[in-house]
Structure formats: structure tokens, C-alpha cells
Amino acid sequence: MELFLDVLSETLVDTAKMLPFLFLAYLFIEYVETRHGERIEALLAGGGRWGAVPGAVLGCVPQCGFSAIASNFYASRVITLGTLMAVYLATSDEAIPLLVSMPAYWDKLILLMVIKVVYAVFVGFLLDFVLRKALPRSLRGGYTGHADEVDCHEEHSDEEGHPQPIWKAALRHTLEIFVFIFAFSLVFGLIVEGVGEDVFASVLGRMGFFQPVVAALVGLVPNCAASVLMTQLYVEGALRFSSLVAGLCTGAGVGLAVLWRVNPSWKQNLFITGLTWACGAAVGVGIQIVVAFIA
């Protein structure tokens, strides 16, 4: 019982320190989505084969919504496969607010976002320009659909249809993610204290070369909680930076789930899911090799 109370109090203090940063981050996100959502959608839909650039930049906005929008646009053939993949690979949803709430990790956050954006644009251009002719026409996407025929908006109103203040939506997101962070941190702390930090670190460390591959697989879970899980594991020292990048590159939030629901071709959906995993695993392993070579 004493062990539980010690871990509980330590977890409560650590997570409570994040609240102000989390709330400010979500307040900014809600403002951007509410005031500029339609412009952002128009920018994404109008990119053509160059759509990987706005796709990667918009994917950085920390919420699951833009990956869902991209999935709807791709299913309606408004955007290309390269643009879709750029959005998926750049999406970080809850990981950004979580790292923003930890000033000690701001340098890692900047590095993470630079890597993800550059890599997302690279993959997008590779698919839309270099490999375009090698892909089936039905898989390429783009050009045949119209953005105004696709409804991608998230409701920000109460049960009676009245507009909801953005601070309320931001507070709701903050509390939701706070509860998850607290619960995960508590369970993680109890496991580490019970098993021992050395044993736990040894298990993850023994994955060696395959840790980014496994992290990329975890990132495919169509839930924003997956990115929180991997970020917390990284902060706790149980996950390498290369594995964090791999997991967050495949962590497209609800984007893949929406794709499976709205795109009628299961073969295309399976290919895109596998491609997302392969791209995430590749960049993670690549970073791991570079770090090992430099060291």
C-alpha cells in the first residue's frame, strides 16, 4: 500500500504540472480549427501533385481531424496518394501538446517535427512523381473528385445546436488527455517499481534493431492514445528517439480507421496501411543506424 501511495502522489504531482501547458496548446488548436478550418481544407484539396507540401504542414497541427479529412478527400479522389501519405506521416495528434507541456523536451519536439515534415514531403513526392507510373491508376487518387462534395467538419456545438466556446472544447480535450496520461503514468510507475527499472529497460533494450519496427506497429492503432503511450514511454526512458519517430509517423490518429470506412477498396486500404507501417519503420531504423554510426 505504501508503494502505491508513493507512486500515486508522485504521478499526481508530475501530471498536474502539465495542465497549464496542455490547456494553452489545445486552446490554440481549437482556435485554428474553428477560425481557419475551411481555408485549411481548401489548401489541402487544391495542392494537386504538390499537395504533399501543404499536407505535411497541415499534418503537424496536433489533432486527429486532419488525417480524417485527408482520408475522406482521398476516398473521393480529391487528393493524391502522396498527399494522403504526407498527412499521415506528419500527423502527431496528442504527442505535440504532451511534449509542449514539458519544456525540457522542446528541443526534441522541434527535431521530431522537422524530421516528420521533411520525411512526409519526401515520401509524398516519391509516390506522386517518381513512382507514379508504377502505381495503378485507381490507387494514385486525385483530380476526379471535388472538395465541396465532402463533409469533413467536426461539430463544435452543444446538444441544442448552440455554438460552443472554444475554451470549453479545449478544456474537455485537456481533461480527457490528462486522465489518460495520469492513468498510464500510474500504471507504468507501478510496473516499473514492481518489476524494477533495470528489468523493464532491459526488456525494451533487447528489442534492439527491431524496437522502431514494433513502435511503428503500435502507432497504427487508430486512436490518439497510441501516440500518448509512446511519448510517455520515451519520456520515461523506455523508448528510443528513433522508435518514437517511427511510432508517431505511423500514428495517423483516426485517419486509417476513417479510410477503411469510407474507401470501398479493401485492397487499397490494406496497401496504404502496410505502406504507412513500412514508411514509419524505415525512418525509425534509418535514424537508429545514423545515430549508431555517429556514436
Could you tell me what each predicted segment is?
Residues 1-31, 38, 111-212, 273-295:
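Selected transmembrane alpha-helices and immediately adjacent juxtamembrane segments
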Residues 36, 260-279:
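Interfacial loop-to-transmembrane junctions
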Residues 39-66:
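Active-site-flanking structural segment that lines cofactor/substrate pockets
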Residues 45-46, 83-88, 270-275:
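Cytoplasmic-side transmembrane-helix entry/capping segments in multi-pass membrane proteins
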Residues 58-113, 192-263:
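Membrane-interfacial helix-loop connectors
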